[in-house]
Curated annotation (Swiss-Prot):
GO cellular component annotations of the record: cytosol
Enzyme Commission numbers on file: 4.1.1.23
Catalytic activities: orotidine 5'-phosphate + H(+) = UMP + CO2
Pathway noted in the entry: Pyrimidine metabolism; UMP biosynthesis via de novo pathway; UMP from orotate: step 2/2
Upper taxonomic lineage: Bacteria, Bacillati, Bacillota, Bacilli, Lactobacillales
Quaternary structure and partners: Homodimer.
MF terms in GO: orotidine-5'-phosphate decarboxylase activity
Species, as recorded: Streptococcus thermophilus (strain ATCC BAA-491 / LMD-9)
Name of the protein in its database record: Orotidine 5'-phosphate decarboxylase
Pfam family, any one: OMPdecase
Keywords: Decarboxylase, Lyase, Pyrimidine biosynthesis
Function: Catalyzes the decarboxylation of orotidine 5'-monophosphate (OMP) to uridine 5'-monophosphate (UMP).
Amino acid sequence: MRENRPVIALDFPTLEDVKAFLAKFPADEKLYVKIGMELYYAAGPEIIRYVKELGHSIFLDLKLHDIPNTVKSAMRVLSNLGVDMTNVHAAGGVEMMKAAREGLGDGPILIAVTQLTSTSEEQMRDFQNIQTTLQESVVHYAQKTAEAGLDGVVCSAHEVPKIKEATNQDFICLTPGIRPAGAAVGDQKRVMTPADAHQIGSDYIVVGRPITQAEDPVAAYHDIKAQWNDQ
């Protein structure tokens, strides 16, 4: 279930910033956007309502990670917002992920974070004390996510083939850390171009600063969209 639109990370601090950014796009251009912690904590459910009124699709990226009952209750609230996709941390465990699925219901796509794309293998081993390879850790989390009945995972594009092999071809792989060729990588450790992510089998890509901080965001979006669709 590949999405042909790049998901734009709306990494802005205020609703006003989002309004100014989205106003640059034609009214009939329906986007897929990611609303993360900073923006949601600043603007609350109002940001969801505003973006949905414009007709855009929303990935609400809050990465819930708590005891199963708390996550279930939180997901029940989020289910009423009308988001198209949201997520949890796979590290919360199978029971927590099952509770999240139950609370959210069957409508929105529910995925789990494996290892953040800012995490290196050295950091994983030193801080998390996980003594496998980074790829093995990600694939393990993906298998547990599938076992819990979720729709897919957030992962680096580099791990997509192994995840598909270990789960199934319909298991969603949403990949952040996407940068056009020559763009600054910022705080991402495991990056890939849109065209390479397409070739390797990613289902969704998330792109932030190369679009939101571009001199012409609309042109940057269309360029990345063309690369993503191998045009």
